[in-house]
């Protein structure tokens, strides 16, 4: 053999690495490359090469930088994709941490690539959420009530140690005269540090209570005036958590089943907005205002010392764990994710309208239909979708699929006296309503299965809401690239 073999001959021509290479070449990586300008030095490896490596590793369910380094030595396809370059795990980890936000924002570009390939239809969009474990143990969390008890106990411990230290000082002064006493006893120092950590965590929860982000059980100065009784408890209201939407005008576009994007969809729900009865829809206190609005968090409000941004959430295994709430809006025609978000809110409902807005912003089109489960229902949200001529399929209550399928469809015209909830119940009993709602199960739930089980995203590697959010959006970007490859996407 006179010439060495070409690396591309090591893998078949229909292998996904060829598609990943082509897709990454079409992405705008200026947010990454600009980080090396203005005296930032040259990157040790081409950023395009590093992004290709991460895309293929995540597609194979490999996220550990050390396992990626091993793939670069042992996996033939990875060696071909990396042009036989072998960055070590330290380089891979630093690149991912440094450009994490930019990697997450590649998700929007994959949506545009799918749209360019004709794979974004927006005739029907299914929305759902899944809980992904945070990089923290639920045993690292402490409730506000336990914090108060522990702070009081440590206050007594510190007082006892101080009295003991003073007594020892006086005894040693009598025996030894002058001595150096600028260091704290070991037990006292540990108690002081622990108390300081707990009090900082209590302050975080108290600030969250004043903002209305956690359940409030007492408004101490105003309790008697409100007639709350001896306990000082007042009823808490369910807050929708809907951010007020700014009006944005999008580029007009045309697509199968979709319409040109008008002003951005939004609704500002009242504090007593109708809830959908979904899981985790606990109540929160209204934001405290005025000089008398001193609030205390509920004793069960949790703070995790490892990842304070994460929350205790119910999981699909009918258990509770330290998690984040990962949300996605998926095109029913192609299973392309058109909107993705991650938050530490337990309830799914507040994510519905922001996801529809994000899908419209990412594609320039409004979906014709939207389906979601009962956790997303509220009359305000349904009406907001209908005002923009989006046909919603969102049950007011959790559906038991066996009895629901056996129910006879309604006949005749709908009664005029039906409210929003009644009209939705009736619509979902029609043949058309059943068919459209069943699209949700075969659209978004398989996507979560592919990401969490086929590619192994059971837990985030990084801590903090911004880092976890970027990781989730990058996972969705990888999913879109793989979906385009399987559907044979071709760009003009």
Task: Walk through the language-model features, giving the residues of each.
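Secretory-pathway/luminal and periplasmic proteins that interact with or process carbohydrate-rich
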Residues: 78-83
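Basic, short loop/linker segments at the boundary and entry of helix-turn-helix/winged-helix-like folds
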Residues: 11-55
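Short, contiguous pre-domain boundary segments
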Residues: 1-5
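Short, charged, low-complexity loops and linkers
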Residues: 6-11, 434-435
């Amino acid at each position: 053999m006179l010439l060495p073999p070409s690396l591309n001959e090591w893998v078949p021509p229909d292998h996904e690495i060829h598609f990943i290479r082509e897709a990454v070449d079409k992405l705008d990586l200026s947010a990454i490359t600009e980080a090396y300008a203005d005296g930032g030095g040259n990157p040790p490896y081409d950023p395009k090469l590093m992004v290709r490596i991460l895309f293929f590793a995540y597609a194979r369910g490999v996220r550990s930088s050390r396992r990626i380094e091993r793939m670069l030595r042992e996996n033939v396809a990875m060696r071909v994709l990396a042009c036989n370059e072998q960055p070590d795990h330290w380089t891979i980890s630093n690149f991912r941490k440094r450009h994490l936000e930019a990697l997450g924002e590649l998700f929007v570009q994959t949506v545009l690539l799918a749209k360019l390939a004709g794979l974004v239809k927006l005739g029907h969009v299914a929305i759902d959420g899944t809980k992904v474990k945070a990089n923290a143990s639920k045993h690292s969390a402490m409730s506000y009530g336990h914090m108060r008890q522990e702070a009081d106990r440590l206050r007594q411990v510190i007082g006892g140690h101080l009295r003991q230290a003073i007594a020892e000082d006086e005894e040693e002064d009598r025996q030894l005269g002058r001595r150096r006493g600028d260091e704290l006893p070991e037990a006292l120092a540990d108690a002081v540090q622990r108390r300081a950590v707990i009090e900082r965590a209590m302050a975080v929860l108290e600030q969250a209570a004043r903002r209305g982000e956690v359940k409030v059980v007492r408004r101490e100065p105003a309790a008697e005036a409100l007639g709350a009784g001896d306990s000082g408890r007042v009823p808490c209201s369910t807050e929708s958590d809907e951010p007020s939407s700014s009006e944005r005008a999008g580029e007009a576009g045309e697509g199968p089943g979709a319409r040109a994007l008008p002003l951005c969809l939004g609704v500002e729900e009242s504090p007593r907005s109708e809830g959908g009865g979904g899981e985790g829809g606990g109540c929160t206190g209204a934001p405290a205002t005025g000089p008398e609005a001193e609030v205390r968090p509920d004793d069960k409000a949790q703070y995790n010392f490892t990842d304070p941004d994460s929350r205790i959430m119910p999981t699909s295994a009918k258990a509770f764990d330290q998690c984040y709430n990962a949300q996605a809006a998926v095109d029913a025609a192609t299973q392309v994710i058109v909107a993705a978000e991650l938050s530490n809110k337990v309830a799914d409902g507040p994510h519905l309208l922001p996801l529809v807005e994000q899908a419209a912003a990412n594609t320039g089109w409004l979906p014709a239909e939207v389906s979601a489960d009962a956790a997303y229902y509220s009359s305000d949200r349904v009406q907001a979708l209908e005002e923009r001529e989006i046909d919603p399929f969102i049950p007011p209550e959790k559906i038991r699929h066996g009895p629901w399928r056996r129910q006879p469809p309604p006949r005749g015209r709908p009664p005029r006296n039906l409210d929003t909830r009644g009209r939705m119940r009736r619509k979902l009993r029609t043949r058309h309503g059943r068919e459209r709602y069943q699209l949700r199960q075969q659209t978004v739930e398989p996507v979560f299965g592919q990401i969490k089980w086929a590619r192994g995203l059971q837990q985030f590697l990084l801590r903090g809401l911004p880092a976890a959010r970027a990781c989730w959006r990058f996972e969705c970007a990888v999913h879109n690239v793989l979906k385009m490859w399987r559907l044979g996407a071709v760009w003009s």
